Design a protein with these regions (language model features):
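Active-site gating loops and adjacent loop-to-helix segments of metal-dependent hydrolytic enzymes
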Residues: 8-48, 176-205, 244-263
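Catalytic metal-binding/acid-base residues of hydrolase active sites
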Residues: 8, 144, 173-175, 215, ...
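Mid-to-C-terminal alpha-helical segments outside catalytic/metal-binding sites
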Residues: 1-5, 11-67, 95-103, 124-128, ...
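A general structural motif
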Residues: 208-211, 248-250, 269-273
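Hydrophobic faces of well-ordered beta-strands that scaffold small-molecule active sites
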Residues: 3-5, 68-70, 109-112, 138-140, ...
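Aromatic-lined glycan-binding groove of carbohydrate-active enzymes
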Residues: 215-260
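Active-site gating/metal-coordination segments in enzymes
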Residues: 66-210
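Glycine-enriched alpha-helix->loop->beta-strand junction motifs that scaffold or abut catalytic
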Residues: 133-137, 162-167, 223-225, 261-265, ...
Length: 331
């Protein structure tokens, strides 16, 4: 069995609502008959592969993917918009992903999308999603964990999640305070050159900061009934953690050594390759890595090839493809 813990879904009725918007996220019809979705920064091609779950199942079958954990794409930035604007659309998503999961219980499990600009509403929607709709947890924005102080603002969600026994997926995404003022122009790319490379570096550095917050602080200590996984192999942290260890030893940093804390959360392998996966296994352990593809934004074939080509033994490979995800979702 193969379980994809990082896959996205945009219900058809939600896509229709996004076509009526003119602030990110919004869907624009292109002259050649295609569509693109405008994000807080940049745009992506938007197609039927986001919404057509019958076609998605056929796509999965062709590649041997048995199950997907579905979430609304955090990169779209809707969950950071003002709550009166975002909450109705996010509730629509939650109802729809629950319906898809009920219709195909062996193929899909849903995560709730939450309106983070109003924490009371976010907590209420998490409870509704998990107790009434049968969702497994929620997707949370990476930027809410860039510092311990920012993470503290999400304690009400973790307290509610701990009582419910949920799974949280931390995915690249902005906080509500990072949303531009209403009516302001969409921000330009911050990169003057080599944008494709610098954007990848920027995203992975941001994920690493969030991973560091959760690994090296005591934020998790009171939430033993919550499971968490980070996107994208924890960002650049696997490459840098040995330097952190060196700094801690040579400069007398108090507390646990960084390498002793790497078992405190799981990471998925979305969008990375075989060599990156091998490094992450050496740092986190194969028991802390789950398969993730970022379908349909990134290539499922790419991730499957990375897991196949990585220099891993069969037991570790199967743990990444199936066993670790099963334990997270069944805790």
């Amino acid at each position: 069995m193969t379980i994809d813990m990082h896959a996205h879904f945009v219900p058809a009725q939600m896509a229709e609502a996004l076509r009526r918007r003119r602030e990110a996220p919004w869907i624009e019809a292109m002259p050649e008959g295609t569509e693109r979705i405008h994000l807080p920064i940049g745009a992506l091609e938007f197609g039927d592969d986001y919404s057509n779950m019958t076609a998605r199942i056929a796509f999965m079958d062709e590649r041997g993917v048995d199950r997907q954990l579905l979430s609304f794409p955090g990169l779209f930035g809707l969950d950071s918009r003002p709550a009166d604007e975002a909450a109705p659309l996010l509730s629509l998503f939650n109802d729809a992903v629950a319906a898809v999961s009920r219709a195909h219980p062996d193929r899909f499990t849903g995560l709730a999308a939450l309106p983070f600009a109003d924490m009371d509403q976010a907590v209420a929607e998490l409870r509704r999603g998990c107790t009434e709709l049968g969702l497994a947890g929620a997707i949370l924005p990476n930027n809410a964990f860039l510092t311990i102080a920012e993470a503290e603002k999400l304690r009400p969600l973790f307290e509610a999640g701990n009582a419910l026994g949920v799974h949280f997926f931390i995915h690249p995404g902005r906080r509500p305070d990072q949303v531009p003022a209403a009516g302001s122009a969409a921000p330009a790319s911050p990169f003057a050159d080599l944008a494709f490379a610098r954007q990848a570096l920027d995203v992975q550095a941001s994920v690493a900061h969030a991973t560091a917050t959760l690994l090296f602080s005591d934020f998790f200590d009171d939430y033993s009934n919550v499971t968490v996984h980070m996107a994208n192999l924890g960002g650049t942290l696997p490459m840098v953690i040995e330097r952190m260890e060196h700094v801690a030893e040579t400069r007398g940093v108090d507390g646990d050594r960084p390498m002793s804390r790497t078992k405190r959360l799981h990471v998925d392998c979305s969008s990375l390759g075989a060599r990156s996966l091998e490094l992450a296994v050496s740092i986190f352990g194969a028991d802390r890595i789950v398969m993730g593809t970022d379908c349909p934004i990134f290539s499922t074939d790419w991730t499957l090839a990375a897991i196949r080509d990585a220099r891993l033994d069969d037991a570790d490979r199967q743990a990444i493809l199936q066993g670790n995800a099963e334990r997270l979702l069944e805790h």
